Structures are given as C-alpha cells and as structure tokens.
C-alpha cells in the first residue's frame, strides 16, 4: 500500500516538529564512550536556548528539518546526538554553552576528517543561529585508540636529537618569499652554525618560480650537514612538503628522506586532515619527524562567538599526527592569553588533563598514552622574551625566533648565538633556583656582559613591545 506524505502510519507522523522534542535530553548522563562537545550558541531572536541546543545536536548527527519515515528503519535513540546541558555564558547576553553527546558509532575509526564533518560540517550555516562556536571536545579513550597520533612524540624526538633539559631553538628563514635556493641555504647554514637546533621553511614557501622545492631541499641539506659537522650537534631544517596533491606531497617527502632530512613540515589546515594523517603515518614508518604549521587557523578560531576554538584544532592535530605544532607565544606579536594558551598547550603534550574552566578546558581528557606534541612558540619574539618563554613553556617546547635571529645587526650567525646564549643563561639561572618571572631582565643583562652578540641584540630590541589585549579570553 502506498502512503502520501501526510498520511499516518503506525509510529510515524509526517510534518515538522521542534528539535527539542527529540534532541534535548537534560536527564541524559553521558557515557564514557560518547564524544562530547561544548558549543557556544547565539540563537536568533525568539529561538529558545533549548531549541537552539537541540538543533545543533540534531543537525550535527541524525536530524534534518522535517520528520522522515526512514527514521523507523533505524534505532534513532541509539544514534542521535543529545543536547544534555545548557548554561548561560557568563557576562554575555543571549549566548549559551550547549553540551552535546554523540554516540561513538557515528564516527569512522581513525578519521578526524569524518569526525569534523559530522560535528561542524553543516550546522554552522543553520538559520536559527546567529553564531556558533565549538569551544571544546572530549574524545573518549575507545575512539582515541583508533588513531596513531604523533609519528614519534616528545621523548623520541629528544632521543633522536640527543638534546635534553632545555627548550629547542628554531628560526624561520626570512624573507619568507623571494630568496634563491642558494641564498636560502646560506641563511640556514649561518643560523644553525650560530647555535640554533632548527631552521624552518615558512608556511607559504612550497615550490614557486623563484625557488623550486628540489633546489631548496638540496641547498638546505648541504647547509644542515655542514653545520652538523662543524658544531658536533644534530641539526635540522623543516622542509615544507605541502603540495597541490597528495602524490606530490609524498614525492617531496621521499626526496627529503633520501638526502638525509631528519624532519619535514606540513600545513595541516590548508592541506587538510586526510593529507596530514597520511603524511603522519608515512613519517612514523620512515623515521622522520613532522613539524606542523597552523596556517589559516585564525580564520577559523579568532572570533569569540563563531568558529572553532584552537584547543579543538590542537586536539585534532594530536589525533591526526604531528610532532610539533605552532601554539602562539603569549608574549609575542600573535594572539594568545596566557591561561587559555597554556590550557591547549597542556592538551597537546600531557597524558591526562583535568577540566578547568579558568583555562578554557571544559572536559577532562585522557590521552591514553598517545605521544605528545611539542608546542612551538613563534611570532614577534626576541632575546628579552627568553626568560618569560622559558618560564611559561618549560623545557618541552620549540622557541622559534625568525626576525629575532635574522634581524640581528651583525647578521644571522650572531643573531643565533645571541638567542642560544640567552637560552642557556635562563636555563642555568632556573636550575640554580632563580625566579625567571621576576629576575628575567637581570639574567639577560648579566649574560650580555660576556656575550657581545647578546649585548647587541638587547640594545636593538630593548624598546620593542606588542601591547594589545588578547581577543581570545574567557
């Protein structure tokens, strides 16, 4: 027997009904296996928060705008997302934290791509909402165990480099575009020879007419090997393998491996999570470290009421795979409140992180022994920032000075030496029990007395400050 769209069958009534009748379940207790999400929801005028939260749960899981008879062909209660709690956002009008629980069966194993497609893929354009932001997610251990995670992790990287007890030092080669491959390699050599551990391609240097990737790789690795031989330290350069296609990306990665590169680089947001996960698995299989740049992140995470918070993007990267990830500086030119920044830094590198609203962490996260990601502090930092950077980030971080190395009045190598001396002075002072937060400037001045390179850097950048209030606050 055929039925029209308006006829009633057993258990089915066609038409449109409020989302909250099905997807708002305040009595629900989340399971240990649920993926949990916290959304900041701004409803349109006249839309109750319960309806808005339920709409988010519905449109990011099993729901659509009208009742469909095929709901009868599945167990909707088993598969639907549930808005189980709603809280007003403190200090904000008509904004609510809506907490949604998703059954684990909604997501493909080991796929950040699928997880994000479900949770944020469609609902952000929903007309009933003025704005929507994904603030945090809780990934259950049962789902985490389907991901490889970082190719190597912090401890394996330290063992590969034979460097312990201090942050690593890096430098982004500037100008980021326009140098020939040979001159680029020269800058790499000078910075590594001066005392840095790493140098780096910038995010947008791929394979342009002025510098094709193969030429850059060859000149750079010649510089790396020469600096290693002269200093006796293991050195590296982040060779950017981001490419127009995955096939080309792997071609570049294979060539980097052939010429002895210990580390390569990838722009994970612009290239996509599928490409990144594939590259991370290749890096583990081939013993290559993977540096991750977050180019394009601020397009997604900068607005306070719409988008995806970087702590979510950082969690997704740890699952997808990367050994380093840019994470802001707190003290440099880029956005970064200290409490919030350290919240997602801990989520990158610690094994277990308790919920802490003061740091923007809405859920306790157990990483189930997944290797950690080393945060990279980069953007407008120089020698005067060194004490604060060491005090804030501790040992397991990469402190990356681009202009703060290459902008030294005496050149690249003295700039690198100034940073290395400043770092070693801060580590020694800390290990002797001195307070870097209170005595930082004095520690740098003392070291500058016997290091002319550091003294010149201190004089050049003594007046440089970036005093803007962060946008990303609680």
UniProtKB/Swiss-Prot annotation:
One of its GO terms (biological process) is reductive pentose-phosphate cycle. The basic functional RuBisCO is composed of a large chain homodimer in a 'head-to-tail' conformation. In form I RuBisCO this homodimer is arranged in a barrel-like tetramer with the small subunits forming a tetrameric 'cap' on each end of the 'barrel'. It catalyses: 2 (2R)-3-phosphoglycerate + 2 H(+) = D-ribulose 1,5-bisphosphate + CO2 + H2O; D-ribulose 1,5-bisphosphate + O2 = 2-phosphoglycolate + (2R)-3-phosphoglycerate + 2 H(+). It comes from the Bacteria. Heterohexadecamer of 8 large chains and 8 small chains; disulfide-linked. The disulfide link is formed within the large subunit homodimers. Its cofactor is Mg(2+). Mg(2+) binds at residues 200, 202-203. The keyword Metal-binding applies. HAMAP family: RuBisCO_L_type1. The active site is at residues 174, 293. The lineage of its organism: Bacteria, Bacillati, Cyanobacteriota, Cyanophyceae, Synechococcales. Substrate binds at residues 122, 172, 176, 294, 326, 378. Its EC number is 4.1.1.39. The disulfide bond which can form in the large chain dimeric partners within the hexadecamer appears to be associated with oxidative stress and protein turnover. Binds 1 Mg(2+) ion per subunit. Keywords: Bacterial microcompartment, Calvin cycle, Carbon dioxide fixation, Carboxysome, Disulfide bond, Lyase, Magnesium, Metal-binding, Monooxygenase, Oxidoreductase, Photorespiration, Photosynthesis. This is Ribulose bisphosphate carboxylase large chain. GO terms for cellular component: carboxysome. RuBisCO catalyzes two reactions: the carboxylation of D-ribulose 1,5-bisphosphate, the primary event in carbon dioxide fixation, as well as the oxidative fragmentation of the pentose substrate in the photorespiration process. Both reactions occur simultaneously and in competition at the same active site. CDD domains: RuBisCO_large_I. It is an enzyme of class 4 (lyase). The modification N6-carboxylysine is found at residue 200.
């Amino acid at each position: 027997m055929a039925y029209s769209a308006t006829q009633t069958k057993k258990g089915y009534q066609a038409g449109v009904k409020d989302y909250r009748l099905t997807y708002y379940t305040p009595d629900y207790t989340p399971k240990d296996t649920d993926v949990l999400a916290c959304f900041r929801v701004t409803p349109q005028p006249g839309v109750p928060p319960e309806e808005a939260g339920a709409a988010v749960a519905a449109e990011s899981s099993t729901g659509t705008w009208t009742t469909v008879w095929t709901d009868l062909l599945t167990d909707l209660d088993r598969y639907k997302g549930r808005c189980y709690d709603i809280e007003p956002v403190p200090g904000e009008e008509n904004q609510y934290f809506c907490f949604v629980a998703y059954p684990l069966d909604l997501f493909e194993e080991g796929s950040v791509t699928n997880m994000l497609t479900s949770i944020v893929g469609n609902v952000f354009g929903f007309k009933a909402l003025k704005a929507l932001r994904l603030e945090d997610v809780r990934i259950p251990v049962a789902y985490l165990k389907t991901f490889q995670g970082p190719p190597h992790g912090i401890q394996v990287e330290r063992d590969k480099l034979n460097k312990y007890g201090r942050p690593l030092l890096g430098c982004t080669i500037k100008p980021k575009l326009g140098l020939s491959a040979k001159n680029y390699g020269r800058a790499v050599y000078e910075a590594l020879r001066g005392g840095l551990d790493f140098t780096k391609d910038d995010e947008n240097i791929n394979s342009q007419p002025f510098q094709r990737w193969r030429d850059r790789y060859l000149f750079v690795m010649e510089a790396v090997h020469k600096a290693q031989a002269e200093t006796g330290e293991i050195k590296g350069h982040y060779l950017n393998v981001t490419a127009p296609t995955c096939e080309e990306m792997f071609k570049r990665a294979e060539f980097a491996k052939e010429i002895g590169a210990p580390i390569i680089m990838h722009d994970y947001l612009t290239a996509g999570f599928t490409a990144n996960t594939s590259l991370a698995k290749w890096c583990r299989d081939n013993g290559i470290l993977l540096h991750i740049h977050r180019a394009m992140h601020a397009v997604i995470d900068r607005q306070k009421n719409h988008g995806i918070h970087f702590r979510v993007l950082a969690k997704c990267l740890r699952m997808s795979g990367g050994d380093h990830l840019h994470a802001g500086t707190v003290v440099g030119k880029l956005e970064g409140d200290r409490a919030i920044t350290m919240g997602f830094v801990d989520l990158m590198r610690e094994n277990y992180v308790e919920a802490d609203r003061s740091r923007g962490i809405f859920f306790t996260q157990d990483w189930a022994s997944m290797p950690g990601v080393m945060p990279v502090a980069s953007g407008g930092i120089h020698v005067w920032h060194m004490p604060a950077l060491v005090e804030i980030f501790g040992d397991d971080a990469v402190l990356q000075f681009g202009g703060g190395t290459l902008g030294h009045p005496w050149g690249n190598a003295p700039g690198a030496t100034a940073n290395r001396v400043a770092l070693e002075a801060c580590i020694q002072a800390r290990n002797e029990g001195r307070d870097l937060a209170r005595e930082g400037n004095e520690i740098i001045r003392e070291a500058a007395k016997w290091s002319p390179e550091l003294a010149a850097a201190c004089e050049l950048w003594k007046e440089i400050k970036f005093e803007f209030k962060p946008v990303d606050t609680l």
